[in-house]
Regions:
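Histidine-centered nuclease catalytic patch
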Residues: 16-47, 56-72
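Short, charged surface segments at domain edges that flank catalytic/cofactor-binding sites
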Residues: 1-16, 39, 74-76
Length: 77
């Protein structure tokens, strides 16, 4: 098992927002928001720019009408 951390998520996602492709002002996004029971697991965390994170807010990507360019996954060693 590879431990989850911000740098590893960014690296997995090629340091780009999974919603718009921006490489600026990167943050982490919970696909299923934490406030709605989302976990801190690899498959629920993605790289997201600040703008898209604000737009998505407390919604799922579907609810926010935002498409992910990649599906989050657990990387291999």
């Amino acid at each position: 098992n590879i431990r989850v951390n911000r740098t590893r998520i960014y690296k997995r996602d090629n340091y780009e927002c999974v919603y718009c492709g921006s490489k600026k002002q990167l943050t982490l996004d919970h696909v299923i928001p934490k406030s709605r029971g989302g976990s801190n697991e690899w498959t629920n965390l993605v790289t997201c720019c600040f703008k898209c994170n604000l737009k998505k807010g407390n919604k799922t990507p579907e609810e926010a009408k935002m498409t992910m360019t990649v599906k989050p996954y657990v990387p291999s060693l």
